[in-house]
Amino acid sequence: MQDTKTISLCHICYRHCEAERVTKEDGIHLIKTCPEHGVSDYLVETNKEFYNNLTYDKSGYSIPQGIMVEVTDKCNLNCPHCYHKPDNKTTDKPIEQILWQIENRFSAEAGAVILAGAEPTVRKDLPELIKQIKALLKKLNRPEDVCILTNGVKLSDRKWVKQIAEAGTRMVMIGMNHHSYQGKKVHEKQLKGIENCIAEGIFVYYVGYTLENLEHMEEVLEEIQSLGNKAWQYRIRAGSDIGRSPDEPQFFLSDHVQLIKDICDRKGWTWEKEPADDNLYHYMVKINGITHRIIQWSDPKTIDMEQLQCGPWCDFVPGKPVTNFLHQIMLRDAVVNEGYNLHDTVPTRYLFQPEQVDYAVTEWTWKSWDDSKVKQKKSI
């Protein structure tokens, strides 16, 4: 990886602003300039050798780009680290609105349709929604791949898993986390959900863990070893300052990788670098032959848009274009959680296929968004 000019966000007003990644004596810095709030300088990596060796190489690795649509603001958990603040009193998006988004906000090259939330499995009509999405994709001559991004609790119900499998769910992504967040009973349900998906023929694309405490790392790695090939990939993420997560451990990606490598060396586990889309936010390895994606998200202070020209592509914020997941959750946090009214535009090169998609939201009002809940603190 090399130093380069890029685009970042002003963490005060959330405008997109010019930035530059620069190597200094103490590590890699992101220096950005907001027209209103001036210059800011943040250290984004301390290990210069690690930074210089990061290589974007997908020759041996294929990841579906995917398009992600929020289908509900409700959730059956209240995870303290989540970027999404659930509202169980709100009304779910109408199925027609979700179908409109899929047809009009994304093109055929996007890949699988990923249903997200808060927690999509709390929708009582989810099987029917999946059926209608499959029918739409068939009509549009697109791949009929529907995926659910879930906390996995509802998956502990085998009969319900059978319903979504028969409706057309092809795969799931499970954010399981360490049991310190939700307790061991919830964790056991999530583990049962993995077994049920496998039994009903639903592919477990990944199981993700967010750590509340770095001391939990070894326990998480041991659980992944016990799960083995039940998931195609396992993701381990330390916290970042997005949404409700100020108390999570925050450190650099090289520290994260080294911590896991030290545990593997001590336990005698094999460590093999896997070619992938490595950057300052994620790093791929195989541990005892099992694929691990080691993740360290940026936050609004350190976001580097040059590293986010990829999927999954998301449509989370009314009136804003379709962009990368991490970028979207920051904008969502600003609009919904913090009450900013964002008038800033997103630079074209970071949009999802701008030459093919009309991003103007003109044919549908975002009925599921209750404007009274968004306290308009600032107009940007």
Please place each PLM-identified region on the residue numbering.
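Radical SAM enzyme [4Fe-4S]-AdoMet core and its adjacent flexible, acidic
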Residues: Y181-M305
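Flexible mid-to-C-terminal extensions adjoining Fe-S/redox cofactors in radical SAM and related proteins
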Residues: M1-T46, F50-N52, K301-I380
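Exposed loop/turn and edge beta-strand positions of beta-sandwich/beta-sheet ligand-binding modules
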Residues: I28, Q65, E109-G111
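Radical SAM/AdoMet-radical enzyme domain recognition
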Residues: I95-A116, R123-R237
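A short, flexible beta-alpha/helix-coil linker loop
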Residues: E49-F50, K85-K89, H179-Y181, S240-I242
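Canonical Radical SAM [4Fe-4S] cluster-binding loop centered on the CxxxCxxC motif
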Residues: G38-E49, Y61-E96
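Cys/His-rich zinc-coordinating "finger" modules and their low-complexity flanking regions
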Residues: N52-K58
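Short acidic donor-binding/metal-coordinating loop in glycosyltransferase active sites
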Residues: V71, G117-A118
